[in-house]
Amino acid sequence: MNSILQTLSKHRSAIMGFAILWIMLFHLRVPTDIDIIDFFRSVGYGGVDIFVFLSGFGLYYSLSRKNFDLKKYYKSRFFRILPEFWVVIGFAFLAQMDFSTRAFYQLICKATTLGYWIGYRDESWFISCIVFLYAIFPVYFKLFKKYGYKASFYFIGAGFSLMLIYALTCILCYNNKNYGGFIILTYARLPIFFIGAIFGHWAKDGCNIRLTKKLKTIALTAAFTAAIILFIFQTYFFYALQTCSLAYLPYIIITPVLCLLLAKFFDKYKTIDKIFTIFGLMSLELYLCHIFIYKLFFDFIDFLDKDSSNILTMLISFFAAYLLYIVNKKVLSRRTNIRIRP
């Protein structure tokens, strides 16, 4: 299995590029009226699972370095995410032209990422989520080095337990109403994050796991079955299962297999790999720009047809993300001596 995991590591940025484009498609406010594209768009929240899986995978590599420094780890993650985040939410705040006390309070909640944890609904929830995951990963890594897979079992089990508690609380106490804001979006990604870390361990530490024909068949069958379940969930039970968190379960099985298949694909088609790698390198900028540009665009512009709206918002997002990426890479990385990477 080690060769395919090395391929996964090699094409990690390209897979992130695929994930961010999928997420951008998911967030489009206007349907395309093409059934297969609209279904692919409707399940685009799986792009987040890909990001989280690859984050766990990559963090294991980072912390396994001989010269690892915890202070530098937190500093690099801080400067990679928060300054750009603050710039974007600052522009969004000014563009909305609302300077009330409530608006300032919401801005502070966003900027500190704390609003997410007290039930504030916000499009930038993923920043709070990933900052939290980055913060706790060194604790997991230390426990994993001491206790091995037992630590992984407890952390993954904690994620499933939070999902189950949330689901039961929603169903039994709140008539399946979303009472916790977007908090479930993090709970639902805890298992796949630590599964990603296990894959990182297998790749980095050279675990001798043979990728036999039987293992391939089991993995593909499990992923295909999960995809069918996802289709059923999405077609017949979308709102009921989305609220109580159960709609996120299929991606825990689908994501690792999908990432491995994408790695094989990008390894074969080099030109496509280079294109998607560019999007992957700008994945943070694309995420930050598109969520606010989509919102502002559709709040203020309603005279374009749906196709023009979709194309224009994505093009503006690409342009804004590229500018933000260049500024961060040229200015911030030079001043902080931190190499900007996904």
What spans do the regions from the language model cover?
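Solvent-exposed interhelical
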Residues: Y134-S161, G200-A222, D302
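Membrane-interface helix caps and helix-loop-helix hairpins in membrane proteins
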Residues: D33-F39, Y116-S124, I171-I183, Y236-C244, ...
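Aromatic-anchored segments of alpha-helical transmembrane domains
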Residues: L21-R29, A111-G115, I156-I171, A222-Y236, ...
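Transmembrane alpha-helical segments and their boundary/interface "anchor" motifs
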Residues: M16, S42-V52, Y61-I118, L133, ...
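Specific transmembrane alpha-helix
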Residues: G47-S62, W125-K142, L164-I209, A247-K268, ...
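Membrane-proximal cytoplasmic C-terminal regulatory module of class A 7TM GPCRs
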Residues: K330-P342
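Alpha-helical transmembrane segments of multi-pass integral membrane proteins
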Residues: L94, D122, F193, T221-S333
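N-terminal membrane topogenic signal
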Residues: M1-F18, G148-A151, L215-I218
